Every structure is written in C-alpha cells, then in structure tokens.
C-alpha cells in the first residue's frame, strides 16, 4: 500500500487546478499499472507562464486605464464599515481566525433552492443576498461591498491548465430597506 501526499501553496494553483492535477495523476497511474493504453492527458498548447505573460502585456495602456476608471467609478463614495465585535480588537492584528461549519437541514436547503428557482436566480445569489442583509443589520449600513472569488478562466484554452487564475470581484450593493425581504 502506498500513499501519495501533495502539498501545494494556494498561490501556485487554484481549486480548479486541483481537479485537473488529480485527474492527470489518476490517468498516469492507470497507464502505469496497465489499466489504460492511453495516458489521456490534455496536450495543452499553452502553459500558465504563457497566460501570465499575455495578461501582463494585454492589460496595459488604454485598456488598463479604462478598467481602473470603471472600478474607481463603481466604488466611488464607498466607505468601509466596521462590524461590532464581542471582544476588544487587539492592538497588533495577527489575522488568526477559525472556521465554523454549519450544516443546513435538507428542508432548509430545499427551501433555499426553491426560493432561487422561483426568483430565477442561483442558490449563490440567494445566499449572498442573505449575507448582505445580515451585514447590513450588523453594520447599520445599506451600502455594502463583498469580495467574491471568480474562476477567471474565460478562455477555453485555460480549461485544462494548472495555475492560479482566480480573481476577486467586488460586488457592491445598495440595499433598498423599504423593499420587503422574502
């Protein structure tokens, strides 16, 4: 019995890449033990370094200026809100934290999916909307921005490339508190 351990830094590859890597290792292993006559690995015409080089040169000049102007306009007037805490903030922030896992009941999960379907949106949008309402209640603010990761693999050629493509998208909302919440 053998055990393969893989340690990767989150800046070297994203979650999408993890799936690609595991698929490639599985194909290669099956080839080695004779379960497959074909490696079945993607023959990528580009590597991550090619994408990185292209991106650095593509996003420059007038395109970069236009994108920066878009985000400056989109986030203009936004003021960071502070959430109330149950403990005093330390003078020296060490960024330590914890993970709290919550399991939704099958019924609640189904109700949320139905709500999404009835409103012609994704479950993600329903949950993000609830998060905005919660943040608004805690912060007493109706102008909110939340960063959310996006895959950033808009080109088909990147589908099987291992690398860190994730980008963070700032999603800003201004809640209308006169609207009822469903």
Give the ranges of each region predicted by the language model:
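A short, structured beta-strand-centered segment in the mid-to-C-terminal lobe
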Residues: 60, 107, 136, 157-182
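Hydrophobic "lid/gating" helix adjacent to the active-site nucleophile
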Residues: 83-84, 115-160, 174
